[in-house]
Regions:
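Short, non-ligating residues that shape and space the ligands of small metal-coordination modules
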Residues: 18-19, 36-37, 85-86, 103-104
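Residues immediately within or flanking Cys/His clusters that coordinate Zn2+
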Residues: 4-6, 22-24, 69-73, 91
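Extended, hydrophilic extramembrane loops/domains of integral membrane proteins
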Residues: 299-328
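Charged, low-complexity helical/coil segments in non-catalytic cytosolic or luminal regions
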Residues: 111-307, 358-363
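Short cysteine-rich clusters marking metal-coordination/redox-active sites
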Residues: 9-12, 27-30, 76-79, 94-97
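Final/C-terminal transmembrane alpha-helix of multipass membrane proteins
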Residues: 337-355
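Intrinsically disordered, low-complexity segments
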Residues: 2-4, 35-71, 105-132
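Cys/His-rich metal-chelating microdomains
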Residues: 13-15, 33, 81-82, 100
Length: 363
């Protein structure tokens, strides 16, 4: 069965219908009329659109003979995490959940990274950033401030898929201008609606999508961006003293997230060009991606995993820029005291205002 085509009014977002009396398209909600040919043009553009999705060229680098001789795989029985380290690795705890890890054998069976961004900041800087992150948090449990938890900070190379693509975009925005005035009887507000169009092409390079399921996507996106000018061809020597998370989300499985990020950025970029209005929102967008390819990279991240009353908390710091992020637990006892104090303060303030108003009436 054919799908039903629906036009939305750029003025009020209502569904436009054909008015047989005027032979025009008319919005039944705001009575705005449109010529049929105007909306027909949108149909013709949509007919000429390319498929919205494309086939990405995904990476497939292989290791040179003997290149992985000094690399070993370690696994965590608690969270399933799997990391890679060299002969010098001294870590004995999982960077994702803090539980013990065990050596499972010689590293094998994964793609060779194309690029790596070496660590720019050391463990001392990570500790300082963590202390800064904890500073001023009155509802934070005291255990989070103990030095032994800070010492669990670990340097991890996190796997990322980097996507390049061009985006051809046709977008229509609804924009408004509002003015207000008053007379002796009434206040007036007039809102004018405008339909604004933007067409163009944007190029995207190295749009990152992390390839680890053990780390929340929001956490990794929160410590972006990574400066790609520091990315260099991968060498195993950079793993010395650190561990590398072994990817468990393939490039193919990351394409959907990459497409969403590119489309969202395209809409935001074009929307920023629609200026001089009081409000702007996307009404309709047609974005086709082409020329897509992906690379495999390792990015430096300092991780701290700790627990509080059965809940695990993972903090992350960009090992290149120092950007820090992570959710904090709340001491429920301290929170209750804080709420009681706030309630008492508000009650006292309300009583004071009421007393002043009563006093003013007497005077």
């Amino acid at each position: 069965m054919a799908g039903m085509l629906e036009y939305k009014c750029p003025c009020c977002d209502g569904a436009i219908k054909f008015d047989s009396a005027t032979q025009k398209m008319k919005c039944p909600y705001c009575d705005t009329e449109f010529e049929v040919d105007t909306l027909k043009g949108y149909d013709e553009e949509l007919k000429d659109e390319k498929p919205s999705e494309m086939e990405w060229a995904t990476p497939g680098g292989s290791w040179a003979e003997g290149e992985t001789a000094g690399l070993h795989t370690y696994s965590c029985k608690s969270c399933g995490g799997e990391i890679v380290g060299d002969d010098t690795m001294a870590a004995s705890a999982c960077p994702f959940c803090g539980n013990p890890i065990v050596l499972t054998g010689q590293f094998a069976g994964a793609l060779r990274p194309d690029l790596i961004i070496p660590f720019k900041l050391d463990k001392k800087a990570a500790k300082a950033k963590l202390q800064e992150h904890l500073k001023g948090k009155t509802l934070l449990p005291r255990v989070f401030r103990s030095q032994n938890h800070i010492d669990e900070v670990k340097g991890v190379y996190v796997p990322f898929w980097l996507f390049d693509s061009d985006a051809d975009a046709q977008l229509r925005f609804t924009a408004t201008r509002t003015r207000s005035w008053s007379d002796s009887k009434y206040d007036y507000t007039e809102t004018n609606y405008y339909s604004v169009r933007r067409d163009g092409t944007l190029g995207f390079d190295a749009v990152p999508v992390d390839g680890s399921s053990k780390i929340e996507d929001d956490l990794m996106e929160s410590i972006e961006p990574f400066a790609m000018q520091d990315a260099i061809p991968f060498q195993t020597a950079y793993l010395a003293g650190y561990v590398a998370d072994k990817y468990d989300v393939t490039a193919e499985d990351s394409i959907e997230r990459a497409n969403r990020r590119i489309r969202r950025s395209t809409e935001e970029t074009f929307q920023q060009t629609v200026t001089g209005y009081d409000s702007v929102k996307v009404e309709n967008s047609s974005i086709q991606l082409h020329g897509g390819k992906a690379k495999y990279a390792l990015f430096p991240v300092w991780l701290l995993s700790t627990s509080w009353r059965g809940e695990n908390y993972l903090f992350a710091m960009n090992g290149q820029t120092g950007k820090f992020c992570g959710d904090l637990p709340v001491d429920k006892g301290a929170a209750r005291k804080w709420m009681l104090g706030l309630t008492a303060a508000l009650s006292a303030a309300s009583y004071g205002v009421m007393w002043l108003l009563w006093l003013a009436r007497i005077l």
